[in-house]
C-alpha cells in the first residue's frame, strides 16, 4: 500500500481519535494529543459528510467540555486548525476556544 504523507497523517489522526473516543466512553479524561486528534477527526469527518466550514467552526465548540479533558488542557487548546477536503476543494477550518 502506497500512501501520500497527507494520507498517512489522516490515518494517524484516525487512530488517535479512535483511542480518544474509547477513553471517553470509559469515562477517562483526554490528554493533549488525544484532544487534538479527537477535534481534528470530527472536522475531517464533518467535511466528508458535506458540512460547511462555518458549520464545523460552530459545532466544534460543542464537541468537548472541560469535564472531558485533563486539567490545563482547555487553556492549552485555544484554537485548532486543520485542512479538510470539502466537495469544492481543500479548506482550512479554525475552531476558536473548542473546549467549553
UniProtKB/Swiss-Prot annotation:
Superkingdom of source: Bacteria
Keywords: Cytoplasm, Hydrolase
Enzymatic class: hydrolase
A biological-process GO annotation: urea catabolic process
Principal location listed in the UniProt entry: cytoplasm
Pfam families, alphabetized: Urease_gamma
MF-aspect GO terms: nickel cation binding; urease activity
Reactions this protein catalyses: urea + 2 H2O + H(+) = hydrogencarbonate + 2 NH4(+)
Subcellular location(s) per record: Cytoplasm
EC number(s) recorded for this UniProt protein: 3.5.1.5
Pathway linked to the protein: Nitrogen metabolism; urea degradation; CO(2) and NH(3) from urea (urease route): step 1/1
Matches recorded under InterPro entries: Urease_gamma (IPR012010), Urease_gamma/gamma-beta_su (IPR002026), Urease_gamma_sf (IPR036463), Urease_subunit (IPR050069)
GO cellular component: cytoplasm
Subunit relationships: Heterotrimer of UreA (gamma), UreB (beta) and UreC (alpha) subunits. Three heterotrimers associate to form the active enzyme.
HAMAP family according to UniProt: Urease_gamma
PANTHER family: UREASE (PTHR33569:SF1)
The family this protein is said to belong to: Belongs to the urease gamma subunit family.
Protein name per the record: Urease subunit gamma
Biological source species: Prochlorococcus marinus (strain AS9601)
Gene: ureA
Amino acid at each position: 500500500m502506497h500512501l501520500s504523507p497527507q494520507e498517512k497523517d489522516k490515518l494517524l489522526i484516525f487512530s488517535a481519535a479512535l483511542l480518544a473516543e474509547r477513553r471517553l466512553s470509559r469515562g477517562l479524561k483526554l490528554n493533549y494529543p488525544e484532544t487534538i486528534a479527537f477535534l481534528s477527526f470530527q472536522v475531517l469527518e464533518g467535511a466528508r459528510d458535506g458540512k460547511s466550514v462555518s458549520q464545523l467552526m460552530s459545532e466544534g465548540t460543542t464537541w468537548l467540555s472541560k469535564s472531558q479533558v485533563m486539567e490545563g488542557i482547555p487553556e492549552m487548546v485555544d484554537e485548532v486548525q486543520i485542512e479538510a477536503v470539502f466537495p469544492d476543494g481543500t479548506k482550512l477550518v479554525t475552531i476558536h476556544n473548542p473546549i467549553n
